[in-house]
Amino acid sequence: MERTFVMIKPDGVQRGLVGEILSRFENKGFKIVAGKFGVLAESIVDKHYEEHLAKPFYPGMKAYITSGPVFRFVLEGDNVVATVRKMNGATNPTEANPGTIRGDYALSIGKNVIHAADSPESAAREIGIHFTPAELVSYTKIDESELYE
């Protein structure tokens, strides 16, 4: 079973979209196996976005991502990395299809509601930055045998 890292950004939290977004993923059949709510420490942001540290847009992005609380969580399911990326929609909301999270809710490319890992390798890296192994919970959903067998 594959896992991915997802983060609802400050604009998504402040607009009251956490429940709606979580419902979309759960309704798709994915399982939430970890979650944290709060304002990110700058050291976590620097680790998470280390590939962007030297880029000119990084200070503004860092200021935004630490401007309010985020909800970070780990989803588990078959092909979860690629499916979550499709459900999120294009990074630029003007290019995101209606019905996707960004197509329905994002207001700008800078404030686009949600982040998700772009590959299984990135997911493992990001999960390791935000969660300890002990924080990842294994359990069986009542309907899981019907979804994955």
Curated annotation (Swiss-Prot):
One of its GO terms (molecular function) is ATP binding. Its main location: cytoplasm. Its EC number is 2.7.4.6. GO terms for biological process: CTP biosynthetic process; GTP biosynthetic process; UTP biosynthetic process. It comes from the Archaea. Its cofactor is Mg(2+). This is Nucleoside diphosphate kinase. The gene is ndk.
